[in-house]
């Protein structure tokens, strides 16, 4: 057999230089993969079938020697590169030349060699592994050789298919993932729901990387890994195959499964929960798995935030995932292009968009975002614009007016508030009534009402601005019938107005508790301030009334005795004499004194309530937010402060309690004096001589100096400066994100006026309007009808149950099927009487699994835009090392394919030359024969 010139041995030196050297390098590498005559130690073996694109030149000794040298050289280089092989594989395990050639061909993308070996070499072990424990399928997937992967997947009993799938998912090889998912092992879909740890328990190496276990975490399923890697196409493919991420149980779950995992390996259990939540919080999984991704993301973000406070060791991980869910919702809102899409996200339903009879959006998703403090979502321009349009409902023209015009409107509303209330009472559905129901007008009316209330508090004290006319010890009266003490008189008209405002605010708070529920009401700190303020006002007025009642009782005694003209000559009873004493002689627990003290506290709280409306202004809003954050820092600081303060207070009291009257002042001699001295020492208002003793007890005095000095250093220099640093840090955080913080606070303020009701401000809300009475009658009618229907339904169910029991006794119902039907009916009756939590959850899920049609269309559009945007962002990244490696592997595969084609063409050419030679040799013979 003649050799082709293209593959003949190269003799002598050729002037081609580099081209010839490159050809020889390629030739040596190609022969390395095709050698079949050398054993593992380089010795000749029995001839094996030749695979690939080289013909067998067994007749050429020079070629054989050259190939042996090439094999030894390349094998030595490979072993040098894979030097630490014994660290990973068993020393007794060795590969045959055939297996090495097979693995190398799979790794480098030599498709012709792999195809021929799979077809012709029946003794080949396709599950053989290299020194790292990887088989041919794993090597082909790792180097993105799709054709080789498809060839290997056709073989039966192929191992580690699951690990190859996980590897392809981690590298983002979509076509390879689709090819592997077409494997018969994934036909039923059970494999996709099985984690590697479950496969190991079944003695299965489906997900195993090598004999030591899996490549990834034992709890990572294909869908979880795809979600981690943000592979949208792969997640979509797996979801179509039926794969889902199972939501972890509650952290405090005590089921057998959770208890067993916690006892076996608590760390692995925690990591498995985090991996599952990472998959659930992935934008790829959120956008493709849920029909209501906004609600799912909001609920999941809150759940992760709660877990961050429970599992402190993984706090940063959970907070990061929670923020990821919030960013996903913000990303969807950012992709909205019209008002309908914004309303769909904020409301969750566009077909039943209007709430109540007034056509105002319910904004259920936005309420949830405010509750879970998704600040970027609430402060987003699309959301703020929607809120602003609702805020100026029925007053759209006022939005474009200047501040001067708005101020005049506010002033006009404040002055005409009684007239506006009368109009709303008698004509709530008129044009003016609709304007009064608008959020902006409600805000202005309530703010004006509260401003009037503060004015009443100021005016109530106006009679004492220049001092009191009666001295504290004055007891003389002009007449015996004027026994009332100073300020122990009946309530003035000013105080009656204040009381009416307080009663109106109490009624408004009661309605709010009824609407929101006690839990939601107590969750808001402003409600706690209102509750405290109103409770103190009520206690003050009650104490004042008690003082007035006792004084009136004493006065009634005087009124009953008209003969009493001069009280100085009459012996009075204690109940009368007590109320004739001067103020300086009053009892400390006197109701009048208690009333005045509580009233002063309530006035301070009332003026602090102004901070509630400050977020409405862009200038004062951030300041109010910073003030609130500062108060929180002070409360945190108080824990350390009180601990240090109490320690020094008790210590100094124990040191100086034996020296009462033996000091220059009374500091530290009592607990009260110790508290005063140490408290004012924080502000530098205590004297150093507070520790000086009049006697020559220098040891005690020195101890006092040391403790007092340590206290000042600790409190003033250390703790006080630490508090200042905390306040500065909080203020800087607010300042860095002032716009978002202010818009979020403003949205919370606006939302309190979006709800229906509470149209009339205090105290006009005390008078029920005809509209309120009408709605009350409708609710009573509905409640009575529901109650009647419920009793009627209960009677029908009881009658059916009695009938079934009678039929059962008579033998009519005797089969197993009928008995099961009876038990089912009992269960249904029980569920009708008291729905279980599970049934309510199923109803909740079904409501989201079957959303309105228009809403579903809108969410599809938004999700499609989000996925496309994510793909664009991913493609816009710079070419990294992994992508360069993929290009290199593609070039390598193309090289082998071209060489195979070249080899095939060479063989065809050699065959044609041989046939042509035979024909040419036959022609002379025929001529001789003819001759």
UniProtKB/Swiss-Prot annotation:
Topological domains on the Cytoplasmic side lie at 1-438, 509-521, 614-636, 728-931
Q: Which SUPFAM superfamilies match?
A: Ankyrin repeat (SSF48403)
Alphabetically, which GO biological process terms does the record hold? Answer: calcium ion transmembrane transport; cellular response to hydrogen peroxide; cellular response to hypoxia; monoatomic cation transport; negative regulation of dendrite morphogenesis; neuron differentiation; positive regulation of calcium ion transport; positive regulation of cytosolic calcium ion concentration
Documented effect of changing residue 143 to S: In FSGS2; increases cation channel activity; does not change the outward peak current; increases significantly the inward peak current amplitude; increases calcium ion transport
Q: What is the effect of changing residue 780 to P?
A: In FSGS2; uncertain significance; decreases calcium ion transport
Tell me the protein's name. Short transient receptor potential channel 6
Which stretches of sequence are listed as region Disordered? Answer: 1-26
Gene Ontology cellular component?
cation channel complex; cytoplasm; membrane; plasma membrane; slit diaphragm
Which tissues carry this protein? Expressed primarily in placenta, lung, spleen, ovary and small intestine. Expressed in podocytes and is a component of the glomerular slit diaphragm.
Q: Which gene encodes it?
A: TRPC6
State how changing residue 110 to H affects the protein, per the record.
Increases calcium ion transport
Q: Describe, as the record does, how this protein assembles with itself and its partners.
A: Homodimer; forms channel complex. Interacts with MX1 and RNF24.
> What spans are recorded as compositionally biased (Low complexity)?
1-23
The record's catalysed reaction(s) read:
Ca(2+)(in) = Ca(2+)(out)
- Predominant location of this chain? membrane
Q: Where are the ANK repeats?
A: 97-126, 132-161, 163-189, 218-247
Q: Name one GO molecular function term.
A: calcium channel activity
- Membrane topology qualifier: Multi-pass membrane protein
Q: Which residues lie on this side of the membrane: Extracellular?
A: 460-487, 543-592, 658-706
Q: What is the effect of changing residue 404 to V?
A: Increases calcium ion transport
């Amino acid at each position: 057999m003649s050799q082709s010139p293209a593959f003949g041995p190269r003799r002598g030196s050729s002037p081609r230089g580099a081209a010839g050297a490159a050809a020889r390098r390629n030739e040596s590498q190609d022969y390395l993969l095709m050698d079949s005559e050398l054993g593992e130690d380089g010795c000749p073996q029995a001839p094996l079938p030749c695979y690939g694109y080289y013909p067998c030149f067994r007749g050429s000794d020079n070629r054989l020697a050259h190939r042996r040298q090439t094999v030894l050289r390349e094998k030595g280089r490979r072993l040098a590169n894979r030097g630490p092989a014994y660290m990973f594989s068993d020393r007794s395990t060795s590969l045959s030349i055939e297996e090495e050639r097979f693995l190398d061909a799979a790794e480098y993308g030599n498709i012709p060699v792999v195809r021929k070996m799979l077809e012709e070499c029946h003794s080949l072990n396709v599950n053989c592994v290299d020194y790292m424990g990887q088989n041919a399928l794993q090597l082909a997937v790792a180097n993105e050789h799709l054709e080789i992967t498809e060839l290997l997947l056709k073989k039966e009993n192929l191992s580690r298919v699951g690990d190859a799938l996980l590897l392809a998912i981690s590298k983002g090889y979509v076509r390879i993932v689709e090819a592997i998912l077409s494997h018969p092992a994934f036909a039923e879909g059970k494999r996709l729901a099985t984690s590697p740890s479950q496969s190991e328990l079944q003695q299965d190496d489906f997900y195993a990387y090598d004999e030591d276990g899996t490549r990834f975490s034992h709890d990572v399923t294909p869908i979880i890994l795809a979600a981690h890697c943000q592979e949208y196409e792969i997640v979509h493919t797996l979801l179509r195959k039926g794969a889902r991420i199972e939501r972890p149980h509650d952290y405090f779950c005590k089921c057998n499964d959770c208890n067993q995992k916690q006892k076996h390996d608590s760390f692995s259990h925690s990591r498995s929960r985090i991996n599952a939540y990472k998959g659930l919080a992935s934008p790829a999984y959120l956008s493709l798995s849920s029909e209501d991704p906004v609600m799912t993301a909001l609920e999941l973000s809150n759940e992760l935030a709660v877990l961050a406070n429970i599992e402190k060791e993984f706090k940063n991980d959970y907070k990061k995932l929670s923020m990821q869910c919030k960013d996903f919702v913000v990303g969807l809102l950012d992709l909205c292009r019209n008002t309908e899409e914004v309303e769909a996200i904020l409301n969750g339903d566009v077909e039943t968009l209007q709430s109540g009879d007034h056509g105002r959006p319910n904004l259920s998703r936005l309420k949830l975002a405010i509750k879970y403090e998704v600040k970027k979502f609430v402060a987003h321009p699309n959301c703020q614009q929607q809120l602003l349009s609702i805020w100026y409902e029925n007053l759209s023209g006022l939005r474009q007016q200047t501040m001067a015009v708005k101020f005049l409107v506010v002033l006009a509303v404040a002055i005409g508030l009684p007239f506006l209330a009368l109009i709303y009472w008698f004509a709530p559905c008129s044009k003016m009534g609709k304007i009064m129901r608008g959020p902006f007008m409600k805000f202005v009316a309530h703010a004006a009402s509260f401003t009037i209330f503060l004015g009443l508090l100021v005016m109530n004290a106006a009679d004492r601005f220049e001092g009191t006319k009666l001295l504290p010890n004055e007891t003389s009266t002009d007449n015996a019938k004027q026994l009332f003490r100073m300020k122990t008189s009946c309530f003035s008209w000013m105080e009656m107005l204040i009381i009416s405002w307080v009663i109106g605010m109490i009624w408004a708070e009661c309605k709010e508790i009824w609407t929101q529920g006690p839990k939601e009401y107590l969750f808001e700190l402003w409600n706690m301030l209102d509750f405290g303020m109103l409770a103190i006002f009520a206690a003050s007025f009650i104490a004042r009334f008690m003082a007035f009642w006792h004084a009136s009782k004493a006065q009634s005694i005087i009124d009953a005795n008209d003969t009493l003209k001069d009280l100085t000559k009459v012996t009075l009873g204690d109940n009368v004499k007590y109320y004739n004493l001067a103020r300086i002689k009053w009892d400390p627990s006197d109701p009048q004194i208690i009333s005045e003290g509580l009233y002063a506290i309530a006035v301070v709280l009332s003026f602090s309530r102004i901070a509630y409306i400050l977020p409405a202004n862009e200038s004062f809003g951030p300041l109010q937010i910073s003030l609130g954050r500062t108060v929180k820092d002070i409360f945190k600081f108080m824990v350390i402060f009180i601990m240090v303060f109490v320690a020094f207070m008790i210590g100094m009291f124990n040191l100086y309690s034996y020296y009462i009257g033996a000091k220059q002042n009374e500091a530290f001699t009592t607990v009260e004096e110790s508290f005063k001295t140490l408290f004012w020492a924080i502000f530098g208002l205590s004297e150093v001589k507070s520790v000086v003793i009049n006697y020559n007890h220098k040891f005690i005095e020195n101890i006092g100096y040391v403790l007092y000095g340590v206290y000042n250093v600790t409190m003033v220099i250390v703790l006080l400066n630490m508090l200042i640093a905390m306040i500065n840090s909080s203020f800087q955080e607010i300042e860095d994100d002032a716009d978002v913080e202010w818009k979020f606070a403003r949205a919370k303020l606006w939302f309190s006026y979006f709800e229906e009701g509470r149209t009339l401000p205090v105290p006009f809300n005390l008078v029920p309007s005809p509209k309120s009475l009408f709605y009350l009658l409708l609710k009573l009618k509905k409640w009575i009808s529901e109650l009647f229907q419920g009793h009627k339904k209960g009677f029908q169910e009881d009658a059916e149950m009695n009938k079934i029991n009678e039929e059962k006794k008579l033998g009519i119902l005797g089969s197993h099927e009928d008995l099961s039907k009876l038990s089912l009916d009992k269960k249904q009756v029980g569920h009708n009487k008291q729905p279980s939590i599970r049934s309510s959850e199923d109803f909740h899920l079904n409501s989201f699994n079957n959303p309105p049609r228009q809403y579903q269309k809108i969410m599809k559009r938004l999700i499609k835009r989000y996925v496309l945007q994510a793909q664009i962002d991913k493609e816009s990244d710079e070419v990294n090392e992994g992508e360069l490696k993929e290009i290199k592997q593609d070039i390598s595969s193309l090289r082998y394919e071209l060489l195979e084609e070249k080899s095939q063409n060479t063989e065809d050419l050699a065959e044609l030359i041989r046939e042509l030679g035979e024909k040419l040799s036959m022609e002379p013979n025929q001529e001789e024969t003819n001759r």
